[in-house]
């Protein structure tokens, strides 16, 4: 069984994240969506809320949702995952993601990173932008799943 970990803050999860997940499921038998917990980063939603939003948005037995504080590559190894999934919205994401993948490879070269490009129509979507638009009164219902929308209201 090919298992991948798709880590992220998912604060909140967006339709862009879900599009990357859908494509990852075409490659892997199981994907673990891993909510990253970073005590040094202020989150809009708690880890528990983010896990709940993802579980409500994703109805697929091939997807497991979990949260973790620590090195993602170590989590992947512990849970039998051979790959990490990273979504790229634009070329500007690549430099940071490449550095992260290189660091993960240094820690454990048995876990590879797979980069999936966002579809052009979803490349502008990110969690911070969603929150800014929502707080400005813009309807974001086309950009986030219903599980997020109900928590924004």
Regions found by a protein language model. Give the residues of each.
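Nucleotidyltransferase catalytic core that binds NTPs
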Residues: 1-153
